[in-house]
Structure formats: C-alpha cells, structure tokens
Amino acid sequence: MSHIYTSADQLIGNTPLLELTHIEQAFQLKARILAKLEYFNPAGSVKDRIAKSMIDEAERTGQLKPGSVIIEPTSGNTGIGLASAAAARGYRLILVMPETMSVERRQLMKAYGAELVLTEGEKGMKGAIAKAEELASEIPNSFLPGQFINPSNPKAHRETTGPEIYQDTDGAVDIFVAGVGTGGTITGVGEYLKSKKPDVQIVAVEPASSAVLSTGVAGAHKIQGIGAGFVPDVLNQTIYDEIIPVEDQKAFETGRLMARQEGVLVGISSGAALWAAMEVAKRREIEGKTIVVLLADTGDRYLSTPLFADPD
C-alpha cells in the first residue's frame, strides 16, 4: 500500500529516538540516554509542531483567513517553522528577531519567503516581542500567534511529543530533559508524561548566565533558542522537578561531542540539554534508568557560530 503525503505539515512529528551508545560508553554513564531528534521535522526543529498547532487553531477560530498577515517574534526556529507553514498555506509572514541570532536562521526564513525585521540584540526577546506588537497594531488583518502566551504551544506537545516519547519507550521513560525557551515543550511533554507516570522526573535546562528560573536574574548568553530572559506565560512552573543551568561553553562543547561521537549534528540548545542529561546520567542513584533528552534542532543553522566555527 502506498503512503504518499500531500502537504509538508503532514510530515511533522513522529521523530525518532536514538540511544547515545557511544557517549554512554565513553563517559561510563549510569543511565541510558535516548535523544529525541527533532530536526527530523520538515523545517528542521521542534518548533514545526507549534507552528502548525497555532496556525490550525487560528484558522479554526477565524483569527486567520485568506489575506491575513502573520507577525511573530522569534529567536529563530519558530519563525522558520511558521515560514514553512505560511508558504504552504499562502499567508504573508513578518518575523521579528534579535540581531544576535545566527545568520543561517535569517537566511532560512527568507528562503521560505518570510519578511524579516531585526531588533537590537541587547533588548533580547523582549525587544522583539515589543516590535512585533507594534507592527501588529499598524498592519491591517494581522495575526500575532504569540508563542510565549499561546496555549496551542504546550497543547502541541501534550498531543504529539509527549505521547510519542511514552509510546516509543513503552512507558519506560524515567527522566525527561529539555531546554526552556517559551516553556511549551517542557510543559506539554511534562504534563502528558506525569499523567501517565506520576513519578517521572522532569528536568528544565536554562543558560547559567541567564538563569531566570533558578535565580530570577536575566543576562546575556549564547545558547540560542532557550533562556528568553523572563518567565513565559505558557510555562507551567510546577511541572519540573529540577533546573540545571548550563554554561555557554559546555553547550558548545557538548554539541560538538554529539557530532563527533554519535555522527549527529545538532544545535546549541541541544548541546545544553545533552550536557544536563549527561550530568544526571552520572548519578549513582540513576543507574539503570532511562533518560529522554529532547534535541530541538539541527546544527546546520549554527555553522557560523562558536558551536562549529573554529571548533577545538
């Protein structure tokens, strides 16, 4: 029987789990680490899931209709996912992004036909959000999905990512590790997994130099895609059991390690999440348990960054 898809968004989800056997052996880890490889989504990241979810819901409720203009602040991946979806559905898309994000992200957005507005890097995501809201107030028939406040964000992960992890491990997942950007992934996956297995441990990962969740103090950092500098509305702060701050350099080193040990190219936030997962996997009390770490995107969009530019 043939299995032929008719739109790119039908390809979203059902991403594979890869056991990191080489890293487990090299570092003599006590636990299994399974990596959820989100770059298998058609536009290359976990954010494809929420792009589809937010657009589907907006079309269902009539907020989006033919001729609408989508405007969204993004650190990159949500913008790329929205650009793919908007192209396929015929919407004009304006993305607002801090100028400090990688040049590859800018190029990818434009490649899908999106318009790009850059904001001052020092203002971070707050600056991008403010500019997007300003544009939305000026442009007729505009729709602002608002990934940081939109309940369709965590909903996508409750309905897809969480069930996929539970099913693919036959319910054997003991610990889930993910970086926190909007908070949608860890909220949706965490809520689903705890509904099926209440003793599952949820570990949040954030940049050490902008450890808002653990210290309340925001700052500049280089781990693109996580650490927005504030606590997003969609983040369920009761869902995680532990917060692990990660230094920028550890994220870079571990991202390169993934490429060189496992032959899998992932991004900076994936390096941060994997470093945290490896730290958990070294604990004696974790022996024999199964850790699932979500690796949010591909490393292709970071070739110009310290992740791969002049690596050690």
Q: Where are these predicted regions, by residue range?
A:
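PLP-dependent amino-acid enzyme catalytic core
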Residues: M1-D312
